[in-house]
Amino acid sequence: MTPTLRRKLEALAERREELQHLLSDPDVVNNNDKFRTLSRELSQLEPVAVALEDEARAKADLSAAEAMRTDPEMRELAEEEIAAAQARLEELDTQLASLLVPRDPRDDGNLFLEVRAGTGGDEAAIFAGDLFRMYARYAERQGWKVEIESDSPGEHGGYKEVVARVVGRGAYSRLKFESGTHRVQRVPATESQGRIHTSAATVAIIPEADDVEEIVINPADLKVDTFRSSGAGGQHVNKTESAIRITHVPSGVVVECQTERSQHANRDKAMKRLKAQLLDTEHSKAAAAQAQTRKLQVGSGDRSQRIRTYSFPQGRITDHRVEGLTLYDLPNIIEGDLDALIARLLHEHQADELARLSDSP
């Protein structure tokens, strides 16, 4: 571990001691909001404290074993204990470094998943449907809930566009690196000559805005349209203009919702998505600026970036943001088995963040 990272760990340990003193202050105890905020911060620092205590014990074990090595009768046992202590210290070094990576406060929250067909006509819509099902099945494995907010089916299957809300603890932390252009290479069912076609779909992962996050939306900047829904709700949806489309004129962002029976409920859902999109745009600009400065790929927030190719003839998936990230497990991945892929992306992002921390004073 670099001296810079070690100093940051020491600062966190000092902050933990400071928080413990603050939380015993009667003024803080009697202030519910402040007590809750400081308690949350302290709980986030506990894993660092535990790892530092484990590291101190491992260093003491190593010193004791090295001292024991001078005794010829104990040398063999000492060598074993030295090896075990060194292995434990290496493990703790990695663990402590990972604990330094700043936690995205949005990680535990829900998200909006948007999948749109790109170039490739009917095959692009079918691929967009495949991607949506892949994420829906992954969500099901995690015990998350998927609620379709709006969709536009393709003429021969799949979706021209589908928007869903994914509800579950940690959903955003697992799927936030999926935004971008996804490309597929395969022989379409309608292709009589057996030729491989290439088509694409875009994915956007937008964290649901927390109620604490403030963003001012001027009602005068909104254009609100109503239309007859084609979604859930039985015959009622086709008789009344309950569906809502909201355009934020300054940014050009358009959201719509047609899944609820009442216009009021659809408007509430649409406004939540609009708020989430506008906040995400701000976060994405900051992430893109940082990525440009450090030449990062994972987590750059660029949705126009081609991030992945799905080659069905070869049964492989290649993620273009991480050198050497090719998995020959396409059949399982497209069925929602994303754990190995997501783990590699999270590891790469963590490495980028640690490099940034090492460079900072």
UniProtKB/Swiss-Prot annotation:
InterPro entries recorded: PCRF, Pep_chain_release_fac_I, Pep_chain_release_fac_I_sf, Prokaryotic/Mito_RF, RF-1
GO molecular function, one term: translation release factor activity, codon specific
Residue(s) carrying N5-methylglutamine: 235
Residue stretches in coiled coil: none
Keywords: Cytoplasm, Methylation, Protein biosynthesis
Any one of the GO CC terms: cytoplasm
Keyword Protein biosynthesis found: yes
Keyword Transport: no
UniProt subcellular location: Cytoplasm
Post-translational modification: Methylated by PrmC. Methylation increases the termination efficiency of RF1.
Pfam hit, one: RF-1
Family: Belongs to the prokaryotic/mitochondrial release factor family.
HAMAP family membership: Rel_fac_1
Function: Peptide chain release factor 1 directs the termination of translation in response to the peptide chain termination codons UAG and UAA.
PANTHER family reported in the protein's UniProt record: LD18447P (PTHR43804:SF7)
Protein name per Swiss-Prot or TrEMBL: Peptide chain release factor 1
Organism: Xanthomonas oryzae pv. oryzae (strain KACC10331 / KXO85)
